[in-house]
């Protein structure tokens, strides 16, 4: 059985499956990189997209919040003779790295990277025992902090919304009971307890801990907030005609990207904050016919591609709009995040 972990990476029960860039051909087709263009890769990871973009003759500005990714990318920086610059930062800050006149393209591959999964000490995998960490940057609140300190109601919200876990209440209450005398310290420790509380059924395609681990990772790294901020930053950073390409791996991420492009299309749909739909100048036009998914051939070769979705837009000449996070209808998790203060 293969568990999709996002970010173009999957995990089999017998061990890890190596990284292969997901939807690589559609990404390059949507970006249209070429000599003389400057493309920003906001999620460098193992450098799969960056390498392919450089091969077209375009120059690349690459970002990653993981210091290990930055260290691992130095050989590529040296080999590409001044055509690649690599920065240790969150991709939500990408507009700080745009050259005068703007970027020709931006690609974001949302999710955990292969290197992060490979390293047991990072705590992303329940198949590889290690500290319950999950911090991409190595700083801030860890998954263990959340599991051992958050209120049970907050755990229910985290697991239910960010992991779409139907058994969030049962799991959260079991965590609360167990951590009083035995705080959770390792990935296998938490995964084992979840498997006892919600045992796997014959029809289940994923491990019982998959959604909880996803929720913790997304929460610890503020992945949805980072994505939302990055989309607004991309709107500011792209030149007219520049292209934004985003690859997501679960419905929460895809929903944010879809809502952003819809809102910026000039025909914004109504929301609970502004029920009436309205028209305004568009800042993005669609690329192609809409969402792109993996072909049957790619999904057969690379099982992790099955859940990948690509959405892309072309920047118009209209000025960037105000960053209005209400368009995403995200829950307010700020109170929970204070446990890191």
Curated annotation (Swiss-Prot):
The cross-references to NCBIfam families, in alphabetical order and at most eight, read:
16S rRNA (cytosine(1402)-N(4))-methyltransferase RsmH
Instruction: List the record's Gene Ontology CC terms alphabetically.
Output: cytoplasm
Protein name (record)? Ribosomal RNA small subunit methyltransferase H
State the superkingdom.
Bacteria
Q: Where does S-adenosyl-L-methionine bind?
A: 47-49, 64, 97, 109, 116
Specify the taxonomic lineage. Bacteria, Pseudomonadati, Pseudomonadota, Alphaproteobacteria, Hyphomicrobiales
Q: Where in the cell is it found?
A: Cytoplasm
Q: Which Gene3D superfamilies is this protein grouped with?
A: Putative methyltransferase TM0872, insert domain, Vaccinia Virus protein VP39
The reaction(s) catalysed by this protein are: cytidine(1402) in 16S rRNA + S-adenosyl-L-methionine = N(4)-methylcytidine(1402) in 16S rRNA + S-adenosyl-L-homocysteine + H(+)
Record's keyword annotation contains Transferase = yes
Q: Supply the alphabetized keyword list.
A: Cytoplasm, Methyltransferase, rRNA processing, S-adenosyl-L-methionine, Transferase
The UniProt entry's sequence similarity note says: Belongs to the methyltransferase superfamily. RsmH family.
Any idea which GO molecular function terms this record carries? rRNA (cytosine-N4-)-methyltransferase activity
């Amino acid at each position: 059985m293969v568990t999709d972990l996002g970010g173009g990476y999957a995990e089999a029960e017998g061990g890890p499956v190596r990284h292969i860039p997901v939807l690589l051909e559609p990404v390059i087709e949507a970006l249209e990189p070429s000599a003389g263009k400057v493309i920003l890769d906001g999620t460098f990871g193992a450098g799969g997209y960056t390498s392919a973009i450089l091969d077209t003759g375009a120059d690349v500005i690459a970002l990653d919040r993981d210091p290990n990714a930055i260290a691992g990318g130095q050989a590529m920086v040296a080999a590409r003779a001044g055509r690649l610059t690599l920065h240790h930062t969150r991709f939500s800050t990408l507009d700080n790295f745009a050259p005068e006149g703007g970027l020709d393209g931006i690609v974001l591959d949302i999710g955990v990277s292969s290197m992060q999964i490979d390293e047991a000490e990072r705590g992303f995998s329940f198949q590889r025992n290690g500290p319950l960490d999950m911090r991409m940057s190595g700083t801030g609140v860890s998954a263990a902090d959340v599991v051992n300190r958050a209120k049970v109601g907050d755990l229910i919200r985290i697991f239910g919304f960010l992991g779409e876990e139907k058994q969030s209440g049962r799991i959260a209450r079991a965590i609360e009971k167990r951590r009083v005398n035995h705080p959770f310290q390792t990935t296998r420790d938490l995964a084992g307890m979840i498997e006892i509380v919600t045992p796997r059924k014959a029809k289940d395609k994923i491990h019982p801990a998959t959604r909880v681990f996803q929720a913790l990772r997304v929460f610890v790294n503020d992945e949805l907030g980072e994505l939302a901020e990055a989309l607004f930053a991309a709107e500011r950073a792209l030149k007219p005609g520049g292209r934004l390409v985003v690859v997501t791996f679960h419905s929460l991420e895809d929903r944010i990207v879809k809502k952003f492009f819809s809102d910026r299309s000039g025909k914004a749909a109504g929301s609970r904050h502004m029920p009436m739909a309205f028209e305004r100048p568009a800042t993005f036009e669609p690329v192609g016919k809409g969402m792109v998914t993996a072909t049957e051939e790619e999904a057969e070769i690379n099982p992790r591609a099955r859940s990948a979705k690509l959405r892309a837009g072309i920047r118009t000449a209209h000025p960037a709009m105000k960053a209005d996070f209400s368009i995403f209808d995200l829950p307010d998790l700020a109170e929970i995040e204070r446990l890191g203060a």
